[in-house]
């Protein structure tokens, strides 16, 4: 692990002894999940998917048992792992926690971004964006910042198609986005 040049020390935890081990927040706590395979060069798709699922299941168990409230996943072949059961990892994780309303958040202290839709081809995005979806996502993000980070967020909803007003008299931003922002402001959410 020295090759990664982490500033914190690493600690390997025994998966079977987790309830007897104390989590040290000053270290990076790792759990090695064995990949059972006799042929190291070629992993069959089913074995890869099974391994990824075991890793996720352990992570979900650790979250549910209160060992952590964070999850970082590395790159995986979502198409093969999810096998058309979910649009993406966000939806997969939501299903494992029985959550119907979720938001994907790319978080940074200065600027965070949350797309209204996830894992959709661009041609389907405009059909999915509704006033209800905008309200749902803004409330999810607002609640996250207030309850988890104890911050009062300033939320900006960017236009769905900002240059459309110059063509005909149809403008999705006026019809969908702007009217929902006004509704959210009435609910005391700092959104523009």
Task: Please place each PLM-identified region on the residue numbering.
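Anion-binding alpha/beta catalytic cores of soluble intermediary-metabolism enzymes, centered on
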Residues: 1-192
């Amino acid at each position: 692990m020295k090759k990664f040049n982490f500033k914190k020390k690493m600690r390997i935890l025994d998966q079977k002894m987790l309830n007897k081990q104390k989590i040290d927040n000053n270290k990076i706590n790792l759990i090695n999940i064995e990949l059972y395979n006799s042929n190291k060069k070629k992993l069959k798709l089913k074995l890869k998917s099974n391994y990824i699922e075991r890793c996720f299941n352990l992570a979900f168990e650790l979250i549910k048992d209160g060992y952590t409230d964070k999850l970082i996943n590395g790159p995986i072949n979502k198409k093969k792992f999810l096998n058309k059961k979910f649009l993406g990892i966000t939806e997969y994780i939501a299903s494992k926690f029985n959550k119907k309303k979720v938001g994907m958040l790319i978080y940074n202290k200065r600027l965070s971004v949350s797309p209204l839709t996830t894992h959709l081809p661009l041609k389907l995005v405009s059909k999915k964006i509704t006033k209800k979806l905008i309200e749902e996502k803004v409330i999810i993000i607002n609640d996250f910042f207030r309850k988890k980070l104890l911050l009062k967020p300033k939320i900006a909803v960017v236009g769905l198609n900002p240059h459309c007003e110059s063509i005909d008299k149809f403008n999705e931003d006026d019809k969908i986005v702007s009217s929902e922002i006004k509704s959210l402001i009435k609910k005391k959410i700092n959104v523009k």
